[in-house]
Amino acid sequence: MILERTIGKAGTVAVGEFTPDGKLVAYKSNEAFSNDLAMMASQFAATVRMFLTTMAASFSHLTGLPLVPYQGFIFSGGDMSSVIRQDHWAIVRTAQSEFTPRGGAAERGLEELARLPGVRLAAYYASEIGEIECKQSMSLSPEVRATATEIVASTTSALRGLATAFEHLSTTRWTPVKGWLYAGGDWVIGVSPCCWLLAHSGEAETNELHRAVMR
């Protein structure tokens, strides 16, 4: 069973199974983690999955790249990280987990990010002004990149709001946003508040990409 396999991973606080409409099926924890909180985590997981599926469908329509169906999501903020797969969620303490950035990862520049396995586009951006600089080995036009960057920035803002809400429910620190990653279709999007990557899932290593964008 997936819960038994994942509860033993380093840094794991709790893992759970949920239905598409956000109902808790089962959960296990390594720390004090109430049933009510597990129910809320399941509601958040279903909400995030539906929201990201909508975002990815829009991104696919814009770029012509298949980013659906949804495959998985990683979020890191404050002291915590979460993973949401098809019908399972996990909550971990980032510093004790595989998502901890390795030495120098947070200092990677745009050229180095663009050379990561599978990466086709790496860009710096600011939510107020859009794209600042971009390196790509694909042919997305400046207009398409501008809209894609706006989608990425607005998604980050929405996830920040959800993280703030869960922070108050769980009494653990989920903000500021450090990075998030979406995998769907044939592609992976990795995002921090200042940069984002687009990588082909057949070549990319998702945990490495997530660590690379974390700030």
Predicted regions and their residues:
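Non-catalytic interaction/Regulatory regions outside core domains
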Residues: 1-215
